[in-house]
Amino acid sequence: TVNGADGKGVGYFESDANRFRLTPRHWAYLRASEGCNQRCAFCTIPSIRGKMRSKSLDDVVAEAGALMDDGAFELNIIGQDTTSWGFDIGDERGLPGLLAGLDRVAQERGGGWIRLMYAYPSKFTDAMIDAIATLPSVVKYLDMPLQHASDSMLTLMRRHITSDQTRDLLARLRKKIPNLALRTTFIVGHPGETEKDFEQLLEFVREQRFEMAGCFKYSHEDGTPSGTMNLDPKLRVPPEEAARREEALMLLQQEIAFEHVAAMAKTNRRLEVLVDAPVEARAKKGEHLYTGRAWFQAPQVDSSTIIRSKRELSPGELVMCEAVDSAEYDLVVKPDDETGRSISLPLANARHKH
């Protein structure tokens, strides 16, 4: 049971300490909380998962240490609303304190990547921005679903933020965190979305040039405010129109994403890449190919970095590389030199052979 700020339990929360991991050994998801208090109009999570329940900082730190001791170099922090971590249990350190605790865990083990996912924009503070900017093991990456950019849609969706406030937040993030990679998601075809609303969203995406963005067509959910709106023919967006809007937005974002990686290749950007897996079937004679990820790429949702190497590499190895080409969403790199190599953790290679 997780205790609330008033000392009363707010729900049962299974510990993840001994769970069976489905991810590769060198990276893992680390759940900081369960449930959500935001109650967006389109979402059923509060009714299914319940109110937000944060793990204690001690529990999150202990699990992080266990995962890193088992070979994980990258920890991806998840929860339905990571921004609000600690609020329900009265931990005034909040998300900055959580990130600082996880950074200490990584630094004590020689380094690592702490990546923040599922942040909620309306409560994202300057202290949270500063934590990402200054903590050495916290990756300069932020996954923050924005859902829309039209004020009327943000109101209908009950997102508790305006378009201008969103722009101000993104400007502060970009200013304080050089090289920040921003991932977001949007919903199109939500009941009440007009062509004007959609055009405002397209203009917002053109303006902000997100490194990564996804788009989903609205999905009807009974029992939600959006679901009730969707029953009104005047508000309902036809499925074919929602599909058109999804395609248009993703084509725009595709162009932006291609340009981001092409620019890195053109300037021969030097960057650290975490090796994920070999792709020997595609390798040329005398060359080894691997998929990996740089700071701007979260596992399973973002693009990959293709590593072309004359030597064998190991999953979990952190390699200093130079960008040499791009292939649509993916960056193509070569290892910088032998002295630029480092393994993710002591004995990491031996552990991965088990």
List where the protein language model places each region:
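Radical SAM enzyme [4Fe-4S]-AdoMet core and its adjacent flexible, acidic
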Residues: 86-110, 157-160, 220-255
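Extended hydrophobic-aromatic, low-complexity segments
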Residues: 140-142, 154-155, 178-181, 196-199, ...
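Flexible glycine/acidic-rich beta-alpha junction loops that bind and position SAM and/or redox cofactors
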Residues: 79-89, 123-125, 146-157, 188-195, ...
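Short flexible coil/turn linkers enriched for glycine and charged/polar residues
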Residues: 22-26, 36-38, 138, 148, ...
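Proteins enriched for Cys/Gly/acidic motifs involved in redox and nucleic-acid/cofactor modification
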Residues: 1-85, 127, 142, 164-175, ...
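Conserved SAM/AdoMet-binding glycine-rich loop
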Residues: 69-198, 206
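Conserved, mostly hydrophobic/aromatic
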Residues: 40, 60, 77, 116, ...
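Terminal RNA-binding accessory module
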Residues: 229-354
